[in-house]
UniProtKB/Swiss-Prot annotation:
PANTHER family: PROGRAMMED CELL DEATH PROTEIN 5 (PTHR10840:SF0)
Organism: Natronomonas pharaonis (strain ATCC 35678 / DSM 2160 / CIP 103997 / JCM 8858 / NBRC 14720 / NCIMB 2260 / Gabara) (Halobacterium pharaonis)
Protein name from the UniProt record: DNA-binding protein NP_4416A
Keywords, in A-Z order: DNA-binding
Coiled coil: none
A cellular component annotation (GO) from this entry: cytosol
InterPro entries, alphabetized: DNA_bind_arc, PDCD5-like, PDCD5-like_sf
Ranges of compositional bias, category Low complexity: 29-41
Length: 115
């Protein structure tokens, strides 16, 4: 084998280098996205801490334990209300109960009639 690389060798090296660069670029983007997600999560937690009383926070945590998707939806609603300025003061446990009742998905009931 001679000391000079062939065209095929050069092309293979280029492909490997391009793949490495793509991977490195992808890692940087995913790290930035992760950092942005963490920052948004921290901001959401701060807003919830500021707007909810201890009792309301406990009730929300209980809802999240039993129904995580519904709990997340309630959190998003509270954050949206707080950011738009539609919440005066703090949300106590009674207001949280009302909010949960309003947001509760309609349960489907089935009437079975026997003949």
């Amino acid at each position: 084998m001679s000391g000079e690389p062939t065209d095929e060798d050069l092309e293979e090296l280029r492909k490997k280098k391009m793949e490495q660069l793509k991977e490195q670029g992808g890692e940087g983007q995913s790290e930035a996205a992760e950092a942005q997600r963490q920052q948004a999560e921290a901001q959401k937690k701060a807003i919830l801490r500021k707007t909810l009383t201890d009792g309301a926070r406990k009730r929300l945590n209980t809802v999240q334990m039993s129904k995580p998707q519904f709990g997340e939806k309630v959190e998003q609603q509270i954050v949206a209300l707080a950011q738009s300025g539609r919440i005066q003061g703090k949300i106590d446990e009674e207001k949280m109960k009302e909010l949960l009742q309003e947001m509760k998905p309609d349960s489907q009931s089935f009437d079975i009639k026997r003949r």
